[in-house]
Amino acid sequence: MERYFTELAVAFVRGRLGRSDATLEEGFDAGLRLHKFKQNTELPRVKRVLGMLHGLAPESLLDIGSGRGTFLWPLLASFPDLPVTAIDWSERRVSDLVAVRTGGVERLSVERMDVEHLSFPPAAFDVVTMLEVLEHLSNPVEGLRRVVQTARRAVIVSVPSVPDENPEHLHLFRVEQLRDMAAEAGCSRVTLEHVLNHRIMLCQKP
């Protein structure tokens, strides 16, 4: 049987069905789409970012562009006491995230918001993660500046490192571009790694 992030999947089922005693099996019977909760911790970029976060030991975290939870579910499972705020622009994705919170994961806060309209105060979160988002932005320099401003200590960003056919990918960033953008955004220390067709950038603030 396939492995799931069971606690999170059950919370989603309870949030969707409106019952605090609902089970995973009842979710399947009700036709809820639970495949998004299959365990994927071994995705190379997810595994590496989680490793970086263990080194940082964040006190609070903002995840930008949480989507269907490819990174968010492993994050919540790996850091069971970490307060996490998840934002996404898709109403459907946000609705799914809210169901998880409503179903019992109270340390998860959810907002419908995009990078270009971040409304959090400066240094509102200890660490900010933004995976597979920067390449979608029409103005990535300004977007990264806003993200860095929202973080107290550090920002972790991942972007594709090879061309693809996704029409929503507006940019393919070189290492030098990312370093320059991070410095311009206010990062004093920038570390870049390459992990299976992706670049992962750790930006630390003074």
Residue ranges and their predicted role:
Residues 1-121, 127, 131, 141-144, ...:
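Conserved N-terminal segment of class I S-adenosyl-L-methionine
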Residues 161-165:
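A short, flexible beta-alpha/helix-coil linker loop
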Residues 131-134, 158:
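Residues lining the SAM
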Residues 152-160:
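Conserved beta-strand signature within the Rossmann-like core of class I S-adenosyl-L-methionine
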Residues 146-150:
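Conserved helix-to-beta-strand junction in the class I
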Residues 137-138, 151-152:
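Helix-to-beta-strand junctions that scaffold the AdoMet/dcAdoMet cofactor pocket
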